[in-house]
C-alpha cells in the first residue's frame, strides 16, 4: 500500500492533490491514501474563517469548500488531524472524528482508525502546559483567548491514547515529540532554522505529551508538521526493541519538502476507512469523565480496564459493520459568485454524524452548552483566559520563521 503523507495543508487541497496526480504519472504508481499532519483548514464559508486563528488580513478561503460542497471530489481517501490553524468550530462538531467532506476524514481531537488492515492513530492540536490539564471548555463564538486555546492538547485525550494496547502502524501529531531532535541531524536543522537553536540546546523544542505517547505506542512510523521544515529521525526503543521512523514535513510550497510517499505491506483490502474497535471501547469507557469546563481533569486511577467495553463494541460492530457514518453537510458552502456578506455569529451545530456515532456507542451528547457538564456559550466567549506568552505572536503564514509556533 502506497501512502502519501503531507505536512501542513493550509487549505491547499487542490495543489496537493494535483502534485500527487503528477507524481503518479511520473513514477507509474498508485497512491492509496493521503495523510495530513494538521493545519488542514477545513474552511467551509465566511463564518468558519472567523474561527481560524489567523490574523484577519491573512485569512483566505483556499480550496476545501469545493470538496465540502461537492464541486470537487477528493481523488484519494484523505485522513487528517488538526493543528493550530483550523476552523475550530467545524472540528469541534466532529470531536470524535468523522467525514469533514466526502472521502476526507478528520481523525478527531484524538483517534484511531483502520485503513484496510493498517492502524492509524493521531493527536490533534499543539501542546501548551497552561491548558493541558483543563477540560475542553471552549465553545463558539470564540474570543481572542478561546480561539487560541481551543486547539491546545488536553490530558484527557492523551490519556485515552495511552490506553491503546494493540500495535499501531502509523501515528500523527501536529507538533513534534519533545526531544526528537536528539535522534536526527539537529546540527543541520539549526543551520537551516537558526531560531530553533536555543530550544534544541535546552531540549524544550516539542511536546512532552507527544514524547510520552511515542515511548508508549512505539509505532513504526510517526509523522508531524508544524515547524515548516523537513526533519527525519530514527528512534530505537531500548536495546533490541522496535524502531520508529519519524518524519516532520513542511507546508505546501514550491521546492519545499512537504510530501513523502511510503510503501507499507498490507492485506488485499478493501482499502477503506473503518472504525477501530479498541478505540471505540476506549472512547466509550472514558466518556463519563469527559471534562467540559475549566476545572482540571484528574483521574485517581490512570489505568482503566476496557475489556468489557471492547466486547460490547465487538458485538455492536459485528451487527452493523465498521464503516463510519456517512458524511452530512451542516452549513452552507462558500459561493464565490455571491457578494461577500458580513459573517453571522458562529454557534455550535450538532453534527448528525456525531449524534449517530454517540448513539452507536450508547453515549450522551456533551459537546454543546445544553447539558450540565459544559459551560455556557456566553461564559466561554467572555473568559479572559490566561495571559499570552511570547509564543502568542502571530506571524504571516508565508514568512520563513517559526510562524506556527505562535500559540
UniProtKB/Swiss-Prot annotation:
<keyword id="KW-0862">Zinc</keyword>
<keyword id="KW-0378">Hydrolase</keyword>
<feature type="binding site">
    <location>
        <position position="174"/>
    </location>
    <ligand>
        <name>a divalent metal cation 2</name>
    </ligand>
</feature>
<keyword id="KW-0539">Nucleus</keyword>
<feature type="compositionally biased region" description="Polar residues">
    <location>
        <begin position="373"/>
        <end position="386"/>
    </location>
</feature>
<keyword id="KW-0464">Manganese</keyword>
<dbReference type="InterPro" id="IPR029052">
    <property type="entry name" value="Metallo-depent_PP-like"/>
</dbReference>
<dbReference type="GO" id="GO:0000398">
    <property type="term" value="P:mRNA splicing, via spliceosome"/>
</dbReference>
<dbReference type="GO" id="GO:0046872">
    <property type="term" value="F:metal ion binding"/>
</dbReference>
<feature type="binding site">
    <location>
        <position position="226"/>
    </location>
    <ligand>
        <name>a divalent metal cation 2</name>
    </ligand>
</feature>
<feature type="binding site">
    <location>
        <position position="228"/>
    </location>
    <ligand>
        <name>a divalent metal cation 1</name>
    </ligand>
</feature>
<feature type="compositionally biased region" description="Acidic residues">
    <location>
        <begin position="389"/>
        <end position="407"/>
    </location>
</feature>
<dbReference type="InterPro" id="IPR041816">
    <property type="entry name" value="Dbr1_N"/>
</dbReference>
<dbReference type="Pfam" id="PF05011">
    <property type="entry name" value="DBR1"/>
</dbReference>
<feature type="region of interest" description="Disordered">
    <location>
        <begin position="373"/>
        <end position="407"/>
    </location>
</feature>
<feature type="region of interest" description="Lariat recognition loop">
    <location>
        <begin position="124"/>
        <end position="154"/>
    </location>
</feature>
<dbReference type="GO" id="GO:0008419">
    <property type="term" value="F:RNA lariat debranching enzyme activity"/>
</dbReference>
<dbReference type="InterPro" id="IPR004843">
    <property type="entry name" value="Calcineurin-like_PHP_ApaH"/>
</dbReference>
<dbReference type="InterPro" id="IPR007708">
    <property type="entry name" value="DBR1_C"/>
</dbReference>
<feature type="binding site">
    <location>
        <position position="39"/>
    </location>
    <ligand>
        <name>a divalent metal cation 2</name>
    </ligand>
</feature>
<feature type="binding site">
    <location>
        <position position="10"/>
    </location>
    <ligand>
        <name>a divalent metal cation 1</name>
    </ligand>
</feature>
<keyword id="KW-0507">mRNA processing</keyword>
<comment type="function">
    <text>Cleaves the 2'-5' phosphodiester linkage at the branch point of lariat intron pre-mRNAs after splicing and converts them into linear molecules that are subsequently degraded. It thereby facilitates ribonucleotide turnover. It may also participate in retrovirus replication via an RNA lariat intermediate in cDNA synthesis.</text>
</comment>
<protein>
    <recommendedName>
        <fullName>Lariat debranching enzyme</fullName>
        <ecNumber>3.1.4.-</ecNumber>
    </recommendedName>
</protein>
<comment type="similarity">
    <text>Belongs to the lariat debranching enzyme family.</text>
</comment>
<dbReference type="GO" id="GO:0009793">
    <property type="term" value="P:embryo development ending in seed dormancy"/>
</dbReference>
<keyword id="KW-0408">Iron</keyword>
<keyword id="KW-0479">Metal-binding</keyword>
<dbReference type="Pfam" id="PF00149">
    <property type="entry name" value="Metallophos"/>
</dbReference>
<feature type="binding site">
    <location>
        <position position="8"/>
    </location>
    <ligand>
        <name>a divalent metal cation 1</name>
    </ligand>
</feature>
<dbReference type="GO" id="GO:0005634">
    <property type="term" value="C:nucleus"/>
</dbReference>
<feature type="binding site">
    <location>
        <position position="84"/>
    </location>
    <ligand>
        <name>a divalent metal cation 2</name>
    </ligand>
</feature>
